[in-house]
């Protein structure tokens, strides 16, 4: 942060002065990053993808192989549990927004069924992405993505 502020001709103290604490800064960053998600734009835009297309896009080798531009839930999910309440609150709200948006695309005869499918889908997507990135065998990683996409994509 010091280097960034120095290049901008500012002090890092002045930057931090805009926040009550470093925890508040972390919560604000989390909320902003989650609010600018390309996935969320696809879920709420005028040309929504099909449920199965969305699952396939998320569980693609391209998404797996680009963690720096990928899903914040997969990147930070296991770490956020050790973060302050304000960061966890921002993370929770971001997840709720995605679950609600995904439920509008999910198959199901009732709102409750679509919400349940959405929750299970988010858990499966994030878990599969984490596992596919963690293993050191490319074929096994592809197999994880394919199995999850097939299973989750079923109505």
Say what each PLM segment does:
Residues 31-37:
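Short, basic, alpha-helical segments at the C-terminal edge of helix-turn-helix-like DNA-binding modules
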Residues 1-28:
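Helix-turn-helix
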């Amino acid at each position: 942060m010091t280097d960034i502020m120095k290049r901008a001709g500012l002090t890092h103290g002045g930057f931090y002065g805009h926040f009550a604490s470093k925890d508040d800064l972390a919560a604000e960053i989390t909320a902003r990053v989650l609010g600018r998600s390309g996935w969320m734009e696809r879920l709420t835009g005028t040309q929504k993808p099909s449920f199965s297309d969305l699952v396939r896009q998320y569980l693609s080798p391209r998404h797996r192989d680009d963690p720096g531009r990928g899903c914040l839930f997969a990147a930070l999910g296991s770490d956020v549990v050790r973060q302050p309440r304000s960061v966890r609150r921002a993370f929770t709200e971001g997840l709720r927004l995605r679950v609600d948006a995904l439920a509008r695309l999910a198959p199901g005869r009732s709102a409750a069924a679509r919400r349940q499918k959405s929750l299970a889908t988010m858990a499966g997507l994030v878990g599969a992405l984490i596992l596919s990135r963690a293993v050191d065998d490319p074929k096994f990683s592809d197999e994880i993505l394919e199995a999850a996409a097939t299973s989750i994509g079923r109505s």
